[in-house]
């Protein structure tokens, strides 16, 4: 397809989970990072010129993605490029997506063979056929296509961009709004002509308008300057925009139907390859309804949990409804329920950590409790 890609790393509202990492580099599903979904969606569509924009704390993201080899992006021309946050900005860091694009104009100008830009965020995880979105965008004749999801708007969750549609046409848009079922939620995936994007960004940023949803899409549509097409996505879409959503969406992967949709064979989700020995299940281990990555040592009881690589659960320990990241050790007779344990955590022998479904306990990286 005649398009280039922009990935926004998004800081989100995940508190300590993203204090020292971007949303894009947040571990998910036992062996992935959230950016893997955006990169895979774009690369599977044949898009080979992709820029990743990040505000800060992007070292772990760069370490994970590297030169993009796993996604077929280690190319002499095009390929993957990290767009640094301070390239041309006089304010130190950008305030919104339009300002970040303004700082990445050189990247857009280099892609003189591409007519369209596909912009995706790393907070919403899905396995979407970007070629179908591009085809629908071109067929619509509209300036911007917004990918949306039904069933997210319920009047209780604040939606970044909520869109009302009747007979295939947009009738209203709201930003940061507790939208009801009348609306569909933007998945933060947009398609726009490259020349129009560059022109719009130049004009809006000069007027101190820096937000994609509010200023370009909704603002342009309300002023009659931008026509908007809506592409309704019918597959699984996981909005990881809070700690509670991240926790619930992670555990939803235990459901076979969710996994089958999110990791469909037609569009694989690629990630950095790490060779590890198989997981060891001791004679006293009991593991039920879990996703377990390679290299774990399991001698205790684990139920309804996600275990990343090289996790140790010692004999007598109980782990239930938990997300346990790489190299974490849960010692003998410890009890951990409804918790997110970051990398290299040690839960000492006999310790009890009991959270709740709506308020999981979080233990930060490297802590001993």
Language model features by range: what are they?
Residues 1-251, 363:
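Unchanged
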Residues 1-8, 195, 203-369:
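Left-handed beta-helix
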């Amino acid at each position: 397809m005649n398009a280039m890609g922009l990935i926004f790393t998004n800081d989100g509202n995940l508190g300590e989970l993203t204090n020292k990492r971007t949303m894009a580099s947040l571990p998910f599903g036992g062996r992935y990072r959230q950016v893997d979904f955006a990169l895979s969606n774009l690369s599977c569509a044949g898009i080979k010129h992709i820029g990743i924009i990040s505000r800060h704390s992007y070292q772990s993201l760069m370490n994970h993605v590297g030169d993009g080899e796993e996604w077929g992006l280690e190319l002499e021309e095009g390929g993957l490029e990290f767009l640094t946050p301070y390239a041309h900005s006089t304010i130190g860091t950008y305030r919104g997506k339009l300002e970040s694009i303004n700082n990445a104009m050189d990247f857009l100008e280099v892609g003189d063979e591409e007519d369209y830009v596909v912009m995706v965020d790393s907070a919403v995880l899905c396995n979407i056929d970007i070629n179908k979105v591009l085809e629908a965008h071109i067929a619509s004749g509209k300036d911007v296509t917004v990918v949306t999801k039904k069933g997210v708007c319920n009047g209780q969750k604040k939606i970044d961009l909520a869109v009302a549609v009747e007979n295939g046409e947009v009738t209203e848009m709201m930003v940061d709004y507790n939208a009801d079922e009348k609306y569909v939620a933007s998945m933060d995936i947009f398609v726009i002509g490259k020349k129009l994007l560059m022109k719009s960004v130049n004009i809006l940023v000069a007027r101190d308008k820096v937000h994609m949803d509010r200023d370009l899409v909704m603002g342009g549509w309300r002023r009659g300057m931008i026509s908007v097409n809506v592409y309704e996505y019918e597959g699984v879409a996981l909005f990881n925009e809070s700690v509670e959503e991240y926790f619930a969406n992670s555990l939803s992967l235990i459901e076979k139907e969710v996994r089958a949709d999110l990791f469909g064979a037609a569009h694989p989700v690629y990630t950095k390859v790490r060779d590890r020995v198989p997981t060891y299940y001791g004679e006293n281990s009991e593991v039920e309804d879990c996703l377990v990555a390679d290299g774990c040592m399991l001698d205790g009881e684990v139920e309804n949990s996600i275990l990343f690589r090289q996790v140790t659960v010692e004999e007598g320990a109980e782990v239930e409804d938990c997300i346990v990241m790489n190299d974490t050790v849960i010692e003998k007779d410890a009890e951990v329920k409804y918790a997110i344990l970051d990398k290299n955590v040690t839960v000492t022998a006999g310790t009890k950590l009991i959270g709740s479904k709506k308020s999981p306990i979080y233990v930060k990286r490297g802590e001993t409790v």
